[in-house]
A protein has these predicted regions:
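Flexible, glycine-rich active-site loops centered on histidine and acidic residues
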Residues: 78-102, 163-233
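Hydrophobic faces of well-ordered beta-strands that scaffold small-molecule active sites
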Residues: 83-85, 124-126, 154-156, 184-188, ...
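Active-site mouth loops of central-metabolism enzymes
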Residues: 92-106, 159-162, 259-266, 360-368
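Glycine-rich, proline-tolerant flexible connector loops at the mouths of alpha/beta enzymes
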Residues: 123-141, 286, 290-293, 392-400
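N-terminal beta1-alpha1-beta2 module of alpha/beta enzyme domains
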Residues: 67-152
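Conserved, mostly hydrophobic/aromatic
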Residues: 83, 128, 145, 176, ...
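An alpha-helical appendage that flanks or caps ligand/catalytic pockets
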Residues: 67, 71-77, 207-251, 284-285, ...
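Extreme N-terminal basic, low-complexity initiation segments
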Residues: 1-16, 21
């Protein structure tokens, strides 16, 4: 991306780091403190970061007059945002469902990913749940999607690591990534409440002494990350069936670069910081532990900033990616209004994941495009993120979900500058 001359004028009413939005070549870091004054900065060489306003990429010179809060809104207008679908892969043997069996859910997931790519979506992601009529074994599906698409990212949001053998998973992930040409984006996590009590026990896993199941999930994740480094760890047999390369052996197939495409699904600020320390990307969800009592999007924006701070402190050299998931429906015809026009959840909800864990569940967005655009501009977590996953009602079928995607891409995304 070329360097561009930029004149920046800011009205400052709170501490603000300009370097959070721009890579500065002549000014290493610019901190603007509240003193009630206007300050003019000449920055001869400013390079937009990946999540910086796309307008800077098009204009030779641009002048901005704003407070940090206004800047937050303007960044939403010119944003390089990766857009993906997120399917929970439900099926129900009901006449009202277009996905009435596991085969329906799997095959329609493949078809929808291909259709999403044709429409201009950037990714297709899938939720993984066990002991439920939902997608549970992601790697065959991801590999199949990889053979039917050419460009879009293919991922999960998320795989429950309490259920995973990290060695099998490293082999499966490597194979699926190679089949897709290096397009996997794997979201993993410690998991959510499941359909059965301690379901991971039926898969043969037990927490170590002093661990709970969340600790076990994080331990499995760390083992998985280590295996993806492709470093030898297994002592070779001196009399092997086939000739071994020199040194310790590692798992095959190995896919270089996959380690940098692992995301952690975080429901708290603490686990977001933990993920940053380990060099994982961040996936936020449609729910979060309620840590402040504020609306979900504000809590998630703070969570994202905590993640970035921890990432910087860890000294990683690459730029991390951050996603948010939202239910967004543009009401443009009678079908949309019939499905989502009335009774949509317009406010966050509070619930309990267990006896001690209070959680906040995000609202749905369903409105006419012009109203939707204004609502989404105010979502601070979307503004902070570089990737937006749109949860889709997969049981309504491929055709209708393609319509939902196309409506967002054509009636909402352009006005918000989502490229």
């Amino acid at each position: 991306m070329p360097f561009l001359p930029v004149a920046v004028v800011l009205a400052i009413n709170s501490p603000f780091q300009l370097s959070e939005l721009y890579s500065l070549t002549e000014v290493q870091s610019t901190s603007l403190l509240a003193d009630g004054s206007w300050r003019r900065l000449s920055l001869p060489h400013v390079r937009p970061r990946s999540a910086a306003p796309a307008a800077l990429c098009a204009d030779e010179r641009i002048a901005l007059v704003m407070t940090p809060r206004v800047l937050l809104g303007l960044c939403a207008d010119f944003k390089q945002l990766v857009r993906g679908l997120l399917s929970f892969g439900h099926w129900t043997p009901s006449p009202q469902s277009q996905a009435r069996s596991a085969a329906d859910a799997l095959l329609q997931s493949i078809d929808l990913a291909a259709e999403a790519e044709r429409l201009g979506m950037d990714g297709a992601y899938f939720r993984v749940h066990h002991f439920a009529q939902q997608l549970a074994s992601p790697f065959p599906l991801l590999a199949a999607v990889g053979t039917k698409t050419r460009k879009i990212e293919i991922g999960t949001a998320v795989i429950d690591m309490r259920y995973e053998n990290s060695h099998y998973m490293a082999e499966d992930a490597g194979a699926a990534d190679l089949i897709s040409g290096g397009r996997l984006q794997l979201g993993i996590s410690r998991g959510s409440p499941e359909q059965v009590i301690d379901g991971w026990r039926y898969f043969g896993y037990r927490p170590n002494e002093g661990e709970d199941d969340a600790d076990m999930g994080r331990r499995h994740a760390e083992e998985f990350l280590e295996l993806l480094r492709g470093k030898g760890f297994a002592q070779p047999n001196p009399r092997p069936m086939f000739t071994n390369p020199p040194g310790l052996l590692y798992l095959e197939p190995y896919s270089a670069g996959l380690r940098d495409r692992i995301w952690w699904g975080s429901a708290s600020n603490a686990t977001a910081a933990w993920a940053a320390k380990l060099g994982m990307n961040l996936q936020t969800s449609t729910l979060k532990f309620d840590e402040t009592g504020e609306p979900l999007h504000i809590q998630q924006a703070a969570q994202i900033r905590a993640f970035r701070a921890a990432w910087k402190e860890a000294g990683h050299t690459r730029t991390p990616r951050i996603s948010v998931s939202r239910s967004i429906f543009a009401l443009i015809d009678d079908r949309d209004r019939g499905y989502f026009g009335r009774g949509s959840q317009e406010e966050d909800k509070i619930g309990f994941l267990d006896e001690n864990t209070r959680a906040i569940f995000g609202r749905s967005y369903a409105a006419e495009p012009d109203i939707l655009i204004e609502q989404l501009r105010k979502d601070e977590a979307i503004v902070e993120a570089d990737t937006l996953l749109l949860t889709i009602p997969n049981q309504l079928g491929v055709s209708y979900n393609a319509h939902v995607i196309e409506a967002i891409l054509t009636t909402v995304a352009p006005a918000l500058g989502w490229r």
